[in-house]
Amino acid sequence: MALLFSLILAICTRPGFLASPSGVRLVGGLHRCEGRVEVEQKGQWGTVCDDGWDIKDVAVLCRELGCGAASGTPSGILYEPPAEKEQKVLIQSVSCTGTEDTLAQCEQEEVYDCSHDEDAGASCENPESSFSPVPEGVRLADGPGHCKGRVEVKHQNQWYTVCQTGWSLRAAKVVCRQLGCGRAVLTQKRCNKHAYGRKPIWLSQMSCSGREATLQDCPSGPWGKNTCNHDEDTWVECEDPFDLRLVGGDNLCSGRLEVLHKGVWGSVCDDNWGEKEDQVVCKQLGCGKSLSPSFRDRKCYGPGVGRIWLDNVRCSGEEQSLEQCQHRFWGFHDCTHQEDVAVICSG
């Protein structure tokens, strides 16, 4: 009897976390099925230490998230942005057999010695072909500019709307950050009939903490499965801080390129920069055509100081504004000011 009581006590007191799908997520990847592993305990999100973390644990996680088969166990520190210092490591180790339906069914060990340098990561095959990489995965449509409008997400090269059920200012903050549009503006505005979407409603019950880098990092209800109507489409308004200038040249149409973000001017790294990007800048400034300056000419304006805001900018050349081009997250780069972009336009 004593042995039976001890066994029952051990089972009932084994540490665990929420078994619902919203209690587990992957953060920082190109889609919702890869990234740093985070779990929820008592309403707080935290990371999992990689002690003993292996492909069997990832297999269970991928199954729980509906992300197909496990494809890898990358380190969690590879994903940006990194876990915040105040965010706790909640689980020391997870030990799954690989047959469980959720991580909550696996053996877990409470944290005693682990830092964010040891955060676990996971990569799944993701048969749903989730969101495209940032910034193409989300947009604000039918609004007065790039930073106001109906929220739409991209799935398999089609745009779909998002139901406002479960939507919050925290989710709006994520969208505005993802689009490089500054802070989210608190608004009670809803889509009018003219701004209703016509595509299927893809997401509902968004549950963002506000710290996510992209909307696809936020837990949500099942994709494509909801009871919403288009009069419940989500509308978001952000500050629109995007502006650019050329400094250090003889006129307003030549110089080192700087962009305005969050009220601060910063430079742009020249990784992948070329003639198409020059064309968009000249077009936006009303400065005629790009003169495609030589490497030497580009360097004559000197390095900037302060922030480097953009890196890996990619334009097709058809954009009307640099904000419509693809780029890394604002502020993320591997550059120095010796790589600052300079542009010379015909004027």
From Swiss-Prot:
Domain of life where this protein originates: Eukaryota
Location in or out of the cell: Secreted; Cytoplasm
SUPFAM superfamilies, alphabetized: SRCR-like
A GO cellular component entry from the record: cell surface
Function: Secreted protein that acts as a key regulator of lipid synthesis: mainly expressed by macrophages in lymphoid and inflamed tissues and regulates mechanisms in inflammatory responses, such as infection or atherosclerosis. Able to inhibit lipid droplet size in adipocytes. Following incorporation into mature adipocytes via CD36-mediated endocytosis, associates with cytosolic FASN, inhibiting fatty acid synthase activity and leading to lipolysis, the degradation of triacylglycerols into glycerol and free fatty acids (FFA).
Underlying gene: CD5L
GO BP terms, alphabetized: apoptotic process; cellular defense response; immune system process; inflammatory response; positive regulation of complement-dependent cytotoxicity; regulation of complement activation
Disulfide bonds: C33-C67, C49-C114, C62-C124, C96-C106, C163-C228, C176-C238, C208-C218, C253-C287, C269-C335, C282-C345, C315-C325
Cross-referenced Pfam families: SRCR (PF00530)
Processing after translation: Not N-glycosylated. Probably not O-glycosylated.
Protein name: CD5 antigen-like
